[in-house]
Amino acid sequence: MSCCGGSCNCGSSCKCGSGCGNMYPDLAEKTTNTSATMVLGVAPAKEQFEGVGKAAESGEAAHGCSCGSSCKCNPCNC
């Protein structure tokens, strides 16, 4: 399990790995060929420290790996 609810992880050069920012990929904006935008849903409110326990369970807390603002690794100790 990676930090940020399983969506972000620290990859090479301490940049967040694949899946970063895709907490709810099925709720992303979709566009059609007619250039119309359809919003499929709204995500529920999140707890401020929701990912802290998950990172600790996975052992990433020992490496200092967590995702900060704009899904950047914070601190950069991966």
Swiss-Prot record:
Keywords: Metal-binding, Metal-thiolate cluster. One of its GO terms (molecular function) is metal ion binding. InterPro entries: Metalthion_15p. Pfam families: Metallothio_2. Expressed in roots. Induction: By iron deficiency in roots. It comes from the Eukaryota. Belongs to the metallothionein superfamily. Type 15 family. Metallothioneins have a high content of cysteine residues that bind various heavy metals. PANTHER family: METALLOTHIONEIN-LIKE PROTEIN 2A, METALLOTHIONEIN-LIKE PROTEIN 4B. This is Metallothionein-like protein 4A. It comes from Oryza sativa subsp. japonica (Rice). The gene is MT4A.
